[in-house]
Regions:
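Rhodanese-like catalytic fold shared by cysteine-dependent sulfurtransferases
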Residues: 1-21, 28-59, 68-101
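Short, surface-exposed ligand- or partner-binding patches at beta-edge/loop junctions that are enriched
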Residues: 63-64
Length: 101
């Protein structure tokens, strides 16, 4: 299955229309410092262990700090059969889109 890149403005639509599970693939400390509402902390290094808990019929939306780690996660998850969306620019872009610097 393929993965798709989206911009922060498209996140709500994917979450609502696809009932996507939102995964923050940054380190736990970064997650604790702030994350997208409703996102689960799923550090990239632990993604193999987490995959068995995800329903393959559920759409996943992943993000990291800048967008590069979430691309790796999206690639890995899509190879395992998940429909995955990743946010271009990561949490930095999400913050800018929502008016935070």
């Amino acid at each position: 299955m393929a993965f798709f890149t989206i911009h922060p403005r498209e996140m709500e639509k994917i979450i609502l229309n696809k009932h996507a599970l939102v995964l923050d693939v940054r380190e736990r400390e970064s997650y604790r410092e702030g994350h997208f509402r409703g996102a689960y902390c799923c550090p990239y290094e632990e993604i193999d262990g987490w995959m068995r808990h995800f329903n393959r019929n559920r759409t996943l939306l992943v993000y990291c700090e800048y967008g590069s780690t979430s691309l790796l996660a999206a690639r890995q998850l899509s190879k395992c059969g998940y429909e995955v969306y990743t946010v271009v620019g990561g949490m930095q872009a999400i913050r800018r889109y929502n008016g935070y610097d």
